[in-house]
Amino acid sequence: ILMLTWEYPPRVVGGIARVVNDLSKRLIKDGHDVTVVTYREGDAPYFEVDKGVKVYRVDNFMINPNNFIDWIMQLNFNMVAKTGEIIAKEGKFDVIHAHDWLVAYAAKTLKQAYDMPIVSTIHATEAGRNSGIREANQKYINDTEWMLTYESTEVIVNSNFMKGELQRLFGLPFEKINVVANGVNLTNYTGIDRDYDFRRRYALDNEKIILFMGRLVYEKGVQYLIGAMPKILEHYHDAKLVIAGKGGMINELKQEVYNMGLGD
């Protein structure tokens, strides 16, 4: 199995890195051979075996610092070149698993060059992130998402809502889309005692905590949760909202909390 992803630990931009990391290691446990080709950031090794997963990382070069799409296309070229080297030494893969539009052109090129099928996971859509398509870059990404789903034998999404969104946006056949929900590896949290002193930093013992954990970016929707707090407090006077995360909206969200008089 060839995994194509623009992020893989130690590079973590969003949720894709965590999904690919956990999925790859679980597939190894199930007896599969998994190779990840991804972007190299910082001093991460060009090659390593991570609990059975073979991880190849490629450099990338910013031709135009102001154009993210140019950067992504260059990354796709480098992924194709690296995968070609791997195939020359080890032979073809049985399947390409492509994660989001960011690796779509690498996946399509490798499919056509080596006759390998694609399974793609669409973690989110450009239309969904932005409540529609309005700009040229958004249209480009939307079109690339369609192309990836068209080239894929099977498409994976993590919810029935996303399945409906892909059908509406791209006209995909119902049977082509498979819902595989994201999960949590509970073994990472076994044996951890409840830390009441830590909880008391944010709420009294008799108060309820609403916890948000995630990137502080528009598409995660934390702004709507903040906006709903006055209505929640009308019915649940003992509720506290705790937001854990970082991202480009952090200062905007802090200002919104201040403007609404919700901060401590």
Question: Where do the language-model regions lie?
Answer:
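N-terminal subdomain of nucleotide-sugar transferases
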Residues: 1-54
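Short His-centered aromatic/hydrophobic patch
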Residues: 98-103, 122
